[in-house]
Each structure stands twice: as C-alpha cells, then as structure tokens.
Swiss-Prot record:
Name under which the protein is recorded: Eukaryotic translation initiation factor 3 subunit G-1
Subcellular location: Cytoplasm
Residues in RRM domain copies: 188-266
One of the record's GO cellular component terms: eukaryotic translation initiation factor 3 complex
Quaternary structure and partners: Component of the eukaryotic translation initiation factor 3 (eIF-3) complex. The eIF-3 complex interacts with pix.
Domain of life where this protein originates: Eukaryota
PROSITE patterns the UniProt entry points to: RRM
Record's keyword terms, sorted: Cytoplasm, Initiation factor, Protein biosynthesis, RNA-binding
Native organism: Drosophila persimilis (Fruit fly)
Amino acid sequence: MPGVETIKSSWADEVELDYGGLPPTTENVENGHKYVTEYKYNKDDKKTKVVRTYKISKQVVPKTVAKRRTWTKFGESKSDKPGPNSHTTMVSEEIIMQFLNSKEDEKANDPLLDPTKNIAKCRICNGEHWSVNCPYKGTAMDTNLMEKKAAAAASAAVDAPKSGKYVPPFLKDSQKGGLGMRGRDDTAAIRISNLSESMTEADLEELVKKIGPQSKMYLARDKNTGLCKGFAYVHFKQRKDAAAAIEILNGHGYDHLILSVEWSKPQNN
C-alpha cells in the first residue's frame, strides 16, 4: 500500500507563519548611516514597509554615562541591542532646568525692581504718575497746591530769624529794607534753569506772577540766534516770595522740562 506523501511548505510560508504574517525587522549600516526596515499593517489592514534612516555620530560622554550603557538589560528588553527600543522605551518631552544663585534670588525679591510697582507719584493729585503728566495740571487743584506751598514757604521765611541761627549782616539789612554796603540787593533773587529755547519774557512773567511781585527779571538769550540759553534770573521785592518760588517751581514740569530753581549766587566785586 503506497504511503501518504507529505507536502512540505516553503520556507517563506514558515517565516510568515512565525512572525504573524510580517517579516522581521532588519538593520543595515552603510556609510555612517543605519537603515532600519520594519513591516506593519496600516489602518486598511494592508501590509506596509517602513524604512527609517539614522545618521551615526560620535560624541564624548562622561565615564558614568558610558559605563551605564554597558549594563545588562533585563525583562522584555533582555535581548535588545544597546540604546533605546521604540517598542519598550518611550522618550518624554525635554525639560530644561535653570539654576539660580542667591544673588539672583535677592534681585528678584527686590521691591524696587518690581515692574508692576509704580514709583512715580504726582504732587498735585497724589496719583501714580509724574506731576508734569497730571491731568489736573493748571486746574483749581494745582492752584490750591501752589497757594499752600507759597503760604508754607512764607511762614518759614518769616520764622527763620526766630530760630536762633546765625544770620549774615547782608540778610539782616535786606529784611530791614536797606541795601547795606553792597549797593545792590540780590537776597531776593532766584535763578531758574533748564528752560526751553522757546521761552520768552512774557512766559517768564506768567510763570512767576502768581507767587509775588517782582522788581526785575532777566532772560538770558543767545546773541546770534536770539533763543533762550536755558536760564533766567528773577528779583522779587520780598525774600519770602523768592523762597516760595523756589519751593513751588523747583522740580516743577514746564514745557516738557523739569525746572531747577535755586538762590542766585551773589556777584563778587
């Protein structure tokens, strides 16, 4: 009786049977590049071939890192080659760490460097802005502030000789109404600087007329252009008015500039 012949399957069928119908993943290294070829099914249940190309580069790493790469893998990755395996290893997002020293911490905690804190304070309405940008500038609020400062400066000038401090002889003569030995009274004169080039005598008079009566005003002008040199002198009839002018106008914003007002220095004979 003839025996039953067994039909042997081809080696290709056996390979597909062992790997679930998909060929195994292969790696090939050529000319400094590694080519990884793998097969998988797409969403339409069709077999697809995926080829990934990696560029091989060499870099210097610390000894501890190089030693860690020689460790024996275990578990499902026991037979894997050195390096991460995409099937068992997931690389998370890169986290950049920033280390701050104590000086930077102190600088960060400095309240003066806080960008949310406004250091400007208006002298007219006490708002968080400069006085030159105050919306109430020139209104009744500003006028009342100037009157209060003038009254305070006048009272301070009157009470000054009663404090027991030394008063120069020429100041005593000016308070009595005399000119002393100088022949010219500069005790009630002030110097206003940081004026704009477009300043005129009318503007200067308008600036100081509310403070007190003046005996003389001088606006320094350039001989060639006729423009203001940036400073002027004002002689008041009373020293208390001059003191009030310094108190009110010094640091006051005028024509987009901050005025600087001080006592006029006496001329040397």
